[in-house]
Amino acid sequence: MSFGTRHDPVRQVALMFVFDPRITALPIVGCEDRFPVRRVYCVGRNYVAHIREMKEGDERDPPFFFQKPADAVVAGGVDISYPPQTDDFQFEAELVVAIGAEAVDISVERALDVVFGYAVGVDLTRRDRQRESFKTGLPWEVGKAFDQSAPCGAIHPVAGVGHRLTGAISLSVNGVERQRGDLNQMIWNTPEIIANLSKSYRLQAGDLIMTGTPAGVGPIVPGDRLIVSVEGLTPLAFSIVGKES
């Protein structure tokens, strides 16, 4: 499959903007080009053990999705500032799927055809704010969709690593392992996620999908060093620093 959108939004015309538009992009392993991020979709409650530790939802529930802004994505190696308005800042290790072609209501059988590659990511969460939103029934972007809330490693093209349907996923804080699972423990696997998501959204090249986290999520504080790994992919490492003034 040739990756790219059916209708290229980039035209060879002179455009003037009131300010330079910011493009969030991630490095690609083995390539000097970068992967421009269009949208970030996240799958909620996709590992049984995580559902049980959070005491929310049911493993028989259909998949549900939320989003983070594209500029919440931070490339590996960049320090993450402890965010404001929280006393319970938590990590969630995730496999990230990078979409390379358009998909609308695609079948499970064809879903992997639109995958450009895979990366390691973390869904950073203001857990106390998220729980407040659950209690009030208000939207929970404040707990999930804030600045620097989606650290992501370099993208490995499928041509180099194949499809990541099984393999260990883990996260350590200051050298102590806090999360460990296997991608085959997902309730909804990658092709099922893509097929379900494409029923509600027109997926396009540049989209990222964070596929859920295994059990073991927990708090982090300034000074902590996180290393996140998915078998066969480049690990993601970053440190938590003090709140921005």
Which residues fall in each region the model found?
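Extended, compositionally biased flexible segments
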Residues: V13-V115
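Catalytic-pocket segment enriched in acidic/His residues
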Residues: V13-F35, N46, H50-E59, A119, ...
